[in-house]
């Protein structure tokens, strides 16, 4: 078969000057800190030697000299001379040239412009996965290389930035230090981040070096993959598409299930659909109805949904299938791009089927214009019709025509070459390319050669050259050693003079290896999950090695996250790339010529095609429960040992799948090494279990726990499968209550998934361990796994907490009584009582930082609860000189996540909004800006310009009177609604400006105008909420009326419990009281603030937070500020807890800051007494909880539910309608949320909401708890009906279902709510149990 494969681009530009028998060759490009080599050849028969002055010089655009180097050299007859120039490290951009002048009577002058290349380093990024879920950790490596693929000596650090899809800076490393050219770090993604494509960018000296993207989204990693391909290449004449559908688990075994196939033709309209049962592989034919094509090919779209049997897990694949008019295509391949008039021209028509195989037996008429060529030919076994054409001396163009008998037509023109000589030289490689081995080349010339020169070029420079003297031969065997300097790629150029014309040729050398010849292998290609695997590495002693392994299933999303051999080749080529021009070989080789009039350079010297050149390629037991199901692992760095090798033993995850393992190595001298392709290995067991468990169930429901058994041993076996009752959490339906396990037996044929299930009830709330073991052959082969499902209460849990605070400056003894307020209608057995002693005010806040509020946080304001408390905790820890570094690290890490979350709500004008891309909010922008400013003390990722822009936006919204009004929607009426002259919002914005040192100066006029407005309004403020924020603003400003405002605020307060507590009774009493406490701290009224603190701590949740975002923000801020003044450093006291007839003792000293708790309080206890004796500070907390049936709640919303008829037990469609019931005409709620919980066994897909009303649209939707709950957000609600339909699907079998519920409530006043229950099918145990599970009554 003929091969006409185009050679690759030469990555070194060379200039050649031939005059007086002198040939000068050198690189066209120069770089800083790199050698520049010039080669001068003397083939002058008259002069025994020539003397030359070489001058390399450069200057900037304004004439400043940046380089001036001269060298005197002499070159003897029939010899080469290599001259090296070392370019300085600090070489900068400029205009450079080299000049060669003859000396001592030798007349010669040539100069050439050189091109400065600034690119001296390149970068790569490796990420451990292509896609991440919220809450995942992103591991990444940055690799920086110089032009020789080594760590650059001058680059010690880089600037790394990670941005979210809106280009907000989420994390940055300003000075990321490189080790062996590598920087490695990670990013913890927040639980509710902005979904989409994120970006990692790397900068050096202010210029971007490299960037890479990864995706953040909700996804489920499929256990199997589906491939859809045409069974035969579809042609128009077939009028059908025949498809092969293959479904295999990632560990290679076939999947059984149903494939739903849909065909879409023109305009993306559904043409037809079919279903077929598939076990591993299936075929289906989709016939067209008069399908006509307008072109030679046309795409149709096929969508295949494959549903796995027993589990209903689904994989959807969409494919573009091309339908062709003809069964083949043709391409003209030529020995050279152009023909020479008067010389033979070889070419061929290559016929290929659309699958890439040669199309033989294609017959047609071949016509070539201008030469009178006409014949009928048939393609041979290689799909070729070979042609040897004889263009005449006067031929200008060849028009090659092919007409097949089936109507296929092809035409292409070939132009003549503008030539100066018929002579040419050819270089052919005649041996393999191997490191340190001899390479043999055949040099062939049409003229008898008296000399030729060869040049070896690599990495932008000439690394070797030679002057060869054949004895007037036309063929010569050139032998060169393949040195390490040539690796990974090089070029060999040969040149000679034939009759006053320089002719030349070249060959590419691609070693397919790197100087750092790193190798990685594993001891087994198939291994059991959870077992050890041995990795063997070899390379340069002491070299750095980076390893990574990930689940092959991730490649279904993307594979650009990893580093591959091809990436290294692209980096290398990127240093030396030149645009190829197939008609100008000088351009492609990077050559330009300088010569006298009587010596010319040939312009068409590519006589033959050449192959790409490549080198050869190197080559009675304990049962452990599978609990580690990672998607990526082995993200590890090691060093090669002194011997040049290293072994590593690692435990593989418990997942049954296929894995990709990759590795690279970096050595300071030999540079980068990487394995040729990822190592693929499989974790699979001869016998194993696959689970299909629900996310959650309700206590008391009968639930089918389903598993599938797989047997790969080639024969049928009886399997014993045991489900365990772990910690007495589980009841086996139809079995004795005392059973600790339940064993079933089932026959498992080979290579077929066999389902087995257990009918159970959950006895306890919380997390229930599901532990299952299966064995065959008397236990010779076993598998076991353990997972957790959540057990939810039948009713709504009602958590409560009573708190007393004490602060003894000297020794005291005091008793605190606690009477528990437990509803008489509480569910039996649901009561839990706990005592907790906190020697530190923020202990529980710190412990629960990542879970302060149980309510949804799906808008820009609520989301701040994941950000602000971390700032307050860090303020407190630093203010009190805490040495608890792990707490500081936890708060800082969560602060970063909260920042990520919040950046979702940044608007294009620099402000912040309550929803993504929904418009700006004055209130929220003030809230976020002041928080970001404070947070910047603890994380450098926050852009000061971003905070400044938000505050500038705020300042621009001030009214001429000094007042601020909300520009966006109102969802927090008291703050934003403009009620009572807008005092609350104006005060709030002023506090944001006053708490920012830059804004306080920049916007001093805005602040002054605002304070004037507040002081003018002070006499008319009668609302405690407004006054509390205004007073705090005046305190921050140091206003002359601050004392008057505080006195007025104190007059509005309420004292109770013998003046041990003080608070302000408004609809926002926690927020109001907290602002008042902040003013007390600013006024240094610490002792007077303690009664306020007493009341505030009594309002807290079990987690240490308050009911809502603003309560938590201001409440914790106030408590923190006072707590900083009341240090627990003097604690020394004893606490007695008395209940019924029992007593429990606790001793506290100044070194204890963690809480102590006691859980063993009987549930029928109604009263506790706690005695404290000693000196110090502490919180006494009695936490209790009970479940209350849903019918016992009062309603302030109208809520209606309608279960629609779907005709199927597997689909649930629930119509939900809600509206606010106002006390005053036309009044509205604050932000309203509707939460729909689903019955056990049902889950929603990604888009569950339809048929929503549009008068008051839904602003946001959250899917929670594994798809078992959906939350809808509204700005507010009035009397209008707000309706939507939610659709869910039954994925698991459940009997005795508890009712599910829908709740609607006002986020800022949760006393305004409504709850309704609903039920679905009332299946009993007998309807879902299998024979051996069924109780006697069935």
From Swiss-Prot:
Glycans are attached at residues 68, 199, 242, 312, 481, 637, 728, 813, 828. GO terms for biological process: antibacterial innate immune response; antifungal innate immune response; cell aggregation; defense response to symbiont; positive regulation of melanin biosynthetic process. The keyword Disulfide bond applies. Disruption phenotype: RNAi-mediated knockdown in females causes a 5-fold increase in the number of oocysts following infection with parasite P.berghei. Inhibits SPCLIP1 binding to P.berghei ookinete surface and to E.coli surface, cleavage of CLIPA8 in the hemolymph and causes a severe decrease in phenoloxidase (PO) activity. In knockdown mosquitos infected with bacterium E.coli, survival is reduced, bacteria proliferation is increased and PO activation is severely reduced. Keywords: Disulfide bond, Glycoprotein, Immunity, Secreted, Signal, Thioester bond. Residues 580-609 are annotated as: May contain the cleavage site. Heterodimer of a TEP1-N chain and an TEP1-C chain non-covalently linked. Forms a complex composed of TEP1-N and TEP1-C heterodimer, LRIM1 and APL1C; the interaction stabilizes TEP1-N and TEP1-C heterodimer, prevents its binding to tissues while circulating in the hemolymph and protects the thioester bond from hydrolysis. Mature TEP1 and to a lesser extent full-length TEP1 interact with SPCLIP1; the interaction is induced by microbial infection. This is Thioester-containing protein 1 allele S3. It comes from Anopheles gambiae (African malaria mosquito).
């Amino acid at each position: 078969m003929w091969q006409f494969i185009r050679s690759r681009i030469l990555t070194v530009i060379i200039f050649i000057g031939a005059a007086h028998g002198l040939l000068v060759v050198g690189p066209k490009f120069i770089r800083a800190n790199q050698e520049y080599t010039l080669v001068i050849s003397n083939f002058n028969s008259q002069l025994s030697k020539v003397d030359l002055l070489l001058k390399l010089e450069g200057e900037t655009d304004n004439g400043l000299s940046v380089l001036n180097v001269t060298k005197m050299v002499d070159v003897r007859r029939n010899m080469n001379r290599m001259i090296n120039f070392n370019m300085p490290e600090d070489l900068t951009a400029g205009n450079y040239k080299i000049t060669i002048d003859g000396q001592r009577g030798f007349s010669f002058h040539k100069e050439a412009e050189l091109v400065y290349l600034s690119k001296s380093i390149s970068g790569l990024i490796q990420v451990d996965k292509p896609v991440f879920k919220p809450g995942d950790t992103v591991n990444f490596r940055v690799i920086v290389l110089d032009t020789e693929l080594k760590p650059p000596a001058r680059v010690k650090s880089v600037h790394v930035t990670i941005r979210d899809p809106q280009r907000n800076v989420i994390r940055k490393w300003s000075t990321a230090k490189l080790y062996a050219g590598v920087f490695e770090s990670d990013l913890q993604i927040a639980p509710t981040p902005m979904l989409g494509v994120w970006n990692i960018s790397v900068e050096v000296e202010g210029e971007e070096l490299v960037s890479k993207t990864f995706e953040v989204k909700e996804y489920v990693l499929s256990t199997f993959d589906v491939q859809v391909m045409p069974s035969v290449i579809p042609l128009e004449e077939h009028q059908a598409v025949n498809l092969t559908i293959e479904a295999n688990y990632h560990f290679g075994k076939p999947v059984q299930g149903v494939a739903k196939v849909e065909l879409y033709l023109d305009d993306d309209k559904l043409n037809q659909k079919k279903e077929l049962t598939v076990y591993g592989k299936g075929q289906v034919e989709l016939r067209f109805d008069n399908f006509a094509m307008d072109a030679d090919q046309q795409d149709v779209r096929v969508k295949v949904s494959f549903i796995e049997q027993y589990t209903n897990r689904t994989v959807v694949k969409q494919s573009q299938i091309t339908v062709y008019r003809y069964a083949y295509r043709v391409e003209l391949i030529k020995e050279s791009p152009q023909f020479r008039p008067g010389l033979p021209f070889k070419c061929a028509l290559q016929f290929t089927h659309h699958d890439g195989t040669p199309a033989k037996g294609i017959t047609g008429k071949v016509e070539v214009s201008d030469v009178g060529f006409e014949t009928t030919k048939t393609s041979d076994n290689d799909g070729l019709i070979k042609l040897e054409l004889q263009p005449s001396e006067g031929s200008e163009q060849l028009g090659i025509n092919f007409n097949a008998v089936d109507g296929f037509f092809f035409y292409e023109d070939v132009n003549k070459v503008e030539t100066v000589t018929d002579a040419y030289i050819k270089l052919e490689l005649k041996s393999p390319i191997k490191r340190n081995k001899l390479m043999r080349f055949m040099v062939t010339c049409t003229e008898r050669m008296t000399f030729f020169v060869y040049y070896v070029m690599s990495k932008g420079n000439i690394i070797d050259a030679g002057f060869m003297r054949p004895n007037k031969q036309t063929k010569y065997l050139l032998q060169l050693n393949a040195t390490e300097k040539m690796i990974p790629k090089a070029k060999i150029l040969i040149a000679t003079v034939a009759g006053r014309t320089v002719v030349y040729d070249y060959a590419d050398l691609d070693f397919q290896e790197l100087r750092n010849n790193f190798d990685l292998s594993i001891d087994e290609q198939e291994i059991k999950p959870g077992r050890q695997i041995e990795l063997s590495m070899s390379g340069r002693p002491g070299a750095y090695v980076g390893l990574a392994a990930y689940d092959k299933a991730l490649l279904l999303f993307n594979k650009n996250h990893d580093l591959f051999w091809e990436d290294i080749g692209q980096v290398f080529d990127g240093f030396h790339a030149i645009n190829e021009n197939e008609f100008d070989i000088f351009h492609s080789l990077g050559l330009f010529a300088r010569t006298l009039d009587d010596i010319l350079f040939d312009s068409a010297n590519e006589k033959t095609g050449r192959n790409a050149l490549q080198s050869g390629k190197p080559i009675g037991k304990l049962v452990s429960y599978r609990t580690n199901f990672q998607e990526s692992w082995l993200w590890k760095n090691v060093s090669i040992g002194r011997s040049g090798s290293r072994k590593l033993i690692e435990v593989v995850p418990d997942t049954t799948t296929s894995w990709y393992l990759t590795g690279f190595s970096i050595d300071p001298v030999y540079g980068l090494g990487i394995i040729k392709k990822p190592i693929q290995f499989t974790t699979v067991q001869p016998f194993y279990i696959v689970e299909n468990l629900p996310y959650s169930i309700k206590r008391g429901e009968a639930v089918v726990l389903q598993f599938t058994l797989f047997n790969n041993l080639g024969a049928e076996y009886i399997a014993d499968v045991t489900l365990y009752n772990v910690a007495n959490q589980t009841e086996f339906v139809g079995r004795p209550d005392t059973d600790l396990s339940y064993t079933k037996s089932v026959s498992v044929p080979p290579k077929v998934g066999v389902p087995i299930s257990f009918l159970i009830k959950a006895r306890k709330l919380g997390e229930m361990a599901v532990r299952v073991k299966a064995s065959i052959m008397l236990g010779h082969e076993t598998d076991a796994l353990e997972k957790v499902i959540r057990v939810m209460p039948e009713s709504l849990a009602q958590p409560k907490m009573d708190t007393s605070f004490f602060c003894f400056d000297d020794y005291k003894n005091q008793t605190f009584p606690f009477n528990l307020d437990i509803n008489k209608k509480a569910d039996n057995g649901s009561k839990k009582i706990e005592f907790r002693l906190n020697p530190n005010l923020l202990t529980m806040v710190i412990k629960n930082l990542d879970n302060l509020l149980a309510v949804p946080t799906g808008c820009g304001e609520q989301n701040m609860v994941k950000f602000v408390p971390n700032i307050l905790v860090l303020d407190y820890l630093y203010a009190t000189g805490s040495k608890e570094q792990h707490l500081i690290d936890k708060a800082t890490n969560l602060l970063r996540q909260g920042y990520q979350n919040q950046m979702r709500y940044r608007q294009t004008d620099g402000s912040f909004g309550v929803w993504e891309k929904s418009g700006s909010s004055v209130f929220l922008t003030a809230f976020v800006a002041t928080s970001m400013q404070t947070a910047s003390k603890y994380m450098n990722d926050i852009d000061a310009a971003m905070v400044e822009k938000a505050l500038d936006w705020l300042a621009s919204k001030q009214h001429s009177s000094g007042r601020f009004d909300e520009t966006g929607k109102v969802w927090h009426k008291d703050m934003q609604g403009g009620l009572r002259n807008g005092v609350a919002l104006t005060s709030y914005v002023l506090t944001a400006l006053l708490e920012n040192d830059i804004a306080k100066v920049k916007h001093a006029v805005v602040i002054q105008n605002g304070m004037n407005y507040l002081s003018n309004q002070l006499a008319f403020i009668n609302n405690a909420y407004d006054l509390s924020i205004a007073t705090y603003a005046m305190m921050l400003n140091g206003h002359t009326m601050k004392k008057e405002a505080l006195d007025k605020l104190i007059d509005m307060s309420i004292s109770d419990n013998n003046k041990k507590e003080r608070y302000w009774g408004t609809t926002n009493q926690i927020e109001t009281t907290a602002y008042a406490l902040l003013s007390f701290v600013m006024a240094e009224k610490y002792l007077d603030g303690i009664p306020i603190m007493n009341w505030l701590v009594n309002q807290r949740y079990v987690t240490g937070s308050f009911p809502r975002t603003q309560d938590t923000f201001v409440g914790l801020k106030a408590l923190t500020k006072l707590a900083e003044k009341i240090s627990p450093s003097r604690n020394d006291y004893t606490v007695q807890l008395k209940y019924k007839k029992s007593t429990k003792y606790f001793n506290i000293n100044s070194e204890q800051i963690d809480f102590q708790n006691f859980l063993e309080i009987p549930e029928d206890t109604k009263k506790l007494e706690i005695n404290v004796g000693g000196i110090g500070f502490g919180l006494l907390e009695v936490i209790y909880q009970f479940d209350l049936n849903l019918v016992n709640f009062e309603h302030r919303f109208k809520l209606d539910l309608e279960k629609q008829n779907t005709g199927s037990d597997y689909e649930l469609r629930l119509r939900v309608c809600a509206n606010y019931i106002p006390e005053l005409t036309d009044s509205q709620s604050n932000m309203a949320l509707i939460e729909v919980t689903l019955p056990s066994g049902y889950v929603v897909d990604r888009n569950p909401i339809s048929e929503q009303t549009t008068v008051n649209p839904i602003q946001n939707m959250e899917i929670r708890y594994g798809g078992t709950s959906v939350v809808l957000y509204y700005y507010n609600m009035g009397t209008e009906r707000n309706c939507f339909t939610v659709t869910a699907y039954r994925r698991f079998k459940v009997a005795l279902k508890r009712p599910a519920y829908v709740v609607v409530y006002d986020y800022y006043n949760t006393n305004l709510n409504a709850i309704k229950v609903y039920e679905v099918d009332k299946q009993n145990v007998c309807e879902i149990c299998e024979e051996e599970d069924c109780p006697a009554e069935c």
